[in-house]
Amino acid sequence: MSENTTQENVFHTNIPSVLAMEFSIKPWQVENTVALLDEGATIPFIARYRKEKTGELDDQTIRNISDRLTYLRNLDERKQEVYTAILSQEKMTDEIEKSIGNAVTLAEVEDIYRPFKPKRKTRASIAKEKGLEPLAKIILEQNKKTVLAQILPQYINEEKGVLTVEDALKGAMDIIAEDVSDNPQVRTVLKKLYNRTGVVESKGDQEKESVYTQYYDFSQTVNKLPGHRVLALNRGEKEGFLKVNITVDLSAAVTEIEKIYIKGKNECADVVKEAIADSYTRLIHPSLDTETRNNLTDMANEGAIKLFGDNLRQLLLVPPVKDKVCLALDPGYRTGCKMAVVDATGKVLEVGVVYMTLPNHNKDIAKKTLKSLIKKHNVDIISIGNGTATKETEMFVASLIKELDKKISYMVVSEAGASVYSASKLAAAEFPDYDVSLRSAVSIARRLQDPLAELVKIDPKSIGVGQYQHDMPKARLEESLDGVVEYCVNTVGVDLNTASAPLLERVSGLNKTTAKNIVAYRE
């Protein structure tokens, strides 16, 4: 037993030292950054206004430090929980304590705790209740002098349900199988094997049509499977079209375990080999199949979230079209094409509906209406939403421009999220007298004039620049996308005289209350 048997926190990772090494920066930079994060300072604020404290670390590095800081603190906390749990069972040893201290991932800590974790009733636990654990230990020792035929009868106990020598041997093998399954060394070796040689396979019912037909007879190695395929397989499985599993060469896996357990050639070793084979197929493989797929999903999620963030950043940082009066068209068929004219500052001048596409089109009236608006408000540019009927609307506008006296241009802009914004409380407060569809037209005009200022009003997840966003961990996705929005706003800056409250609240050092107060004071 370790001398350190108190239940005080005995695991204190030198986090500044670890982070300094991981990020190749000075320990004092880490210490100051951690202190600022613990005080509640936001990452954009630290990156821009505390450069002297951090040694001019950029926002992405600070964000990465924040993520790792959280992980390492959780790791220390879990180490202590596991240490305390094993200690309470009076099974702590110096070796186990050292293993816990040396663990660098949560998965390693869980593998160490696995043999001590309270279990539901298992075949092994039932065998132990029947008094067969000593027999299992004898077999595991693999002493050449052990003769099973002589010792097995000693464990027959009718009262406990061990009626024959076969019952005794089977129970002992169940105990050995669970011991093998719970062995951290076994799991570490096999995880490497799964990551190196494992193959992800999926099967589907050829008679069922779906978007997953390419995965109906699919296989690819674990270490080469791209994230988007992981997420596609997960969704196909969730929707009931696919059956997905990981396969590993059985003999290779069993051989790796035997290297750890088998001590030579004898009768007991043969029994242990049989128990190892059972352990792998019944206990280890299902567990590692799940764990490996979870790891693949975690990596795929992180990759998808990063791609989502990169796409969002590009969209938010599209250069604005400044000082232009804009006519926006939100194309449609049956309900017509919604339009809005806004001045160079984004103020709405006029809204309406024209019918230039089937089935209710009247192109002559539509042209006359638009020409009148362009002349009345001295429109400089036309913004067309890229949704339904965009192609027809674009052709109509191109024809219209040729008939105008003044030089005017048009641009097709993304209307992703416009419908979400138009139905939001923010849009209702901004345009209480406008129909939802007309609010969308206003948004399409403004996102051409200043994409960042307009798009910050929309939930980043609704802008539609990422794959499988509904399969992502919601909190992690929101945290990442909020970070991107903050980065963009603070990189570009805002005009205090014109910026909206949603834009101002993204500025480092401001919040919803101060943003609203600024707008109220300005008005």
Residue spans for each PLM region:
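Generic start-of-chain signal for non-secretory N-termini
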Residues: 1-31, 38
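Duplex nucleic acid-engaging cores and interfaces of nucleic-acid transaction enzymes
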Residues: 2, 61-64, 71, 75-328, ...
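Long, highly charged, low-complexity intrinsically disordered interaction regions
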Residues: 3-4, 12-15, 74-91, 101, ...
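Amphipathic alpha-helical segments within well-ordered protein domains
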Residues: 17-20, 34, 47-50, 66, ...
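Short, well-structured alpha-helical segments
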Residues: 30-35, 62, 97, 101, ...
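Active-site catalytic pocket residues across diverse enzymes, especially alpha/beta-hydrolases
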Residues: 50, 401, 522
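Short, well-ordered loop/turn and helix-capping segments at boundaries between secondary-structure elements
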Residues: 52-55, 141, 182, 450, ...
